[in-house]
Regions:
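Non-ligating segments of multi-cofactor redox enzymes
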Residues: 1-205
Length: 205
């Protein structure tokens, strides 16, 4: 049976610490932008944590919601991409081929979750920050769209190791950076097609 990767987030466990956001930046070579660029709506965050407030001061309750690419089954971003840079792969992921992208930004306009980002400039990594770049992830250039990939580089590496050892992937052995960094284990990742996986059970609960 083919894999179908999915994620479940327990909002009651999320504390809004944004460790997931930081881990995502480090793992996927996401550039930081200046305050001026951020004010123009050019912030690069594959994952963000939204805050919702209930009640009136001093009895205020805060709820947090991590938001990232939903890897939609019928993704509207894929339908509008003229070069098929946005497409579904064999694992059910909404994948992005950077070399195909011509920067029309149609996909960003079609995305209902506002989780696709355009590179308005070539990223800069002043020394010694260039030493922290992850060699498993390509650095995107100006004019290219990017978004959450569920850390596809980790998925590919885990599948290669499993194939080499003639075994199936074990549930829980593979985690994207956000799930690995979450201190409360609010983010659960796994194979939705495996009914015994934790993520599949959570989605049914």
């Amino acid at each position: 049976m083919p894999y179908r990767w999915g994620m479940a987030v327990d909002l009651d466990k999320c504390t809004g610490c944004e460790a997931c956001v930081t881990a995502c930046h480090a793992e996927n070579n996401i550039p930081t932008v200046s305050p001026q660029q951020s004010a123009r709506g050019r912030t690069m965050h594959w994952m963000r944590v939204e805050r919702y407030y209930e009640g009136n001061f001093p009895d205020v309750r805060v709820k947090f919601r991590p938001v990232l690419c939903q890897h939609c089954d019928n993704a509207p971003c894929e339908a509008v991409c003229p070069t098929y840079a946005a497409h579904h792969n064999e694992d059910g992921l909404n994948a992005q081929v950077y070399n195909r992208c011509i920067g029309t930004r149609y996909c960003a306009n079609a995305c209902t979750y506002n989780v696709r980002f355009f590179n308005f400039f070539n990223p800069e990594w002043p020394k010694p920050l260039h030493l922290q770049l992850n060699p498993d992830v390509s650095v995107r250039e100006v004019g290219v769209m990017e978004k959450c990939t569920f850390c596809v580089q980790r998925i590919k590496a885990a599948k290669i190791e499993a194939k080499k050892d003639h075994r199936e992937l074990v549930d829980g052995a593979l985690q994207p950076a956000c799930a690995q960094a979450c201190p409360t284990s609010a983010i659960v990742f796994g194979d939705v097609n495996n009914p015994e996986s934790r993520v599949a059970r959570l989605m049914q609960s």
